[in-house]
Every structure is written in C-alpha cells, then in structure tokens.
Regions:
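Short hydrophobic/aromatic patch on the recognition helix
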Residues: 41-51
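Amphipathic alpha-helical packing segments from all-alpha helical-bundle domains
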Residues: 67, 71, 117-132
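Hydrophobic alpha-helical connector segments
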Residues: 60, 75-102
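Alpha-helical DNA-contacting segments of helix-turn-helix folds
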Residues: 58-65, 72, 110
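A short, Lys/Arg-enriched amphipathic alpha-helix from helix-turn-helix/homeodomain DNA-binding modules
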Residues: 12-21, 67, 71-74, 90
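Amphipathic alpha-helical segments used for helix-helix packing
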Residues: 98-121
C-alpha cells in the first residue's frame, strides 16, 4: 500500500474512531458532523470524501465494529485448540459476550443502532468491511 493509500486509511479510521467515541459518549442524535471533524482534527470536506452524511458513517461504523468483533473472535478461535464444532460455537459465543461485558460502549452502540438491514447492506456491498 502506498503512502497516499495509507494516509486515506488513517483519515478514515480517525473519523470512525472519533465518531464511535462521540456516539457512545454524547449519543448519536447529539453528535454533529462538525463535532466529529473538529475532534478528529480534519476538515469537513474530508468527512464528505468518505461518507455521505452522519447516517452513512453510522452504518459503516456498525459494519466496521461488528466485523472487527467477529474477526477478533475468529483469530481467538484459530489460536485455541478446540476439538469439535459445538465447543467452537460455545467458544465464539463466550468470546463475544465477554467482549461486550468488557466494552460496554460497544455493546450500547451496536444494540441501539444495529438493525439487520443496516448490517446486511454494509456487509453485502463489501463497504468498509473489506477495506481493513
């Protein structure tokens, strides 16, 4: 990946993380695009290079955070030596529950904003999830 692509990815990740922090702190409704770009230290135009609006950002953030969670669970499963399928299912379920217990903000954000349609749209189009 070139320097330009690295810079783009860094800016997008900065916007995503800043939005997540604000959405979980202030709430989605009380957070503005201006709040996000000001805290991220980026120009408003940069925001619109990556997202149509705050709702588009939220949808992509849901897919991104859910994808991260499942990717992390998959990596942990790969590292564990588990003999059968049922035990694997229990392991992944326990992993996700423990992660939600340790990261209340993530659970709150996903539970308030995740609808199957939003997740399917974001994952189905491959937006953001495949850009990791």
């Amino acid at each position: 990946m070139g320097k330009v692509e690295d810079n783009k990815k860094l800016k997008m990740n900065t916007l995503l993380q800043t939005a997540f922090d604000l959405f979980t702190g202030k709430g989605f409704a009380k957070t503005t695009v201006s709040d996000i770009v000001n805290q991220a230290g980026l120009a408003k135009g940069t925001f619109y290079l990556y997202f149509k609006d705050k709702y588009d950002l939220r949808d992509k953030l849901i897919a991104f955070k859910a994808s991260q969670l499942f990717d992390d669970a998959h990596k942990a499963l790969d590292a564990a030596v588990i003999p059968d399928f049922e035990e694997e299912i229990l392991f992944v379920t326990d992993y996700i529950i423990e992660r939600f217990q340790n990261q209340q903000g993530l659970m709150k954000f996903l539970s308030k904003n995740l609808s199957w349609g939003v997740f399917q749209d974001a994952v189905g189009t491959g937006s953001l999830v495949s850009q990791k």
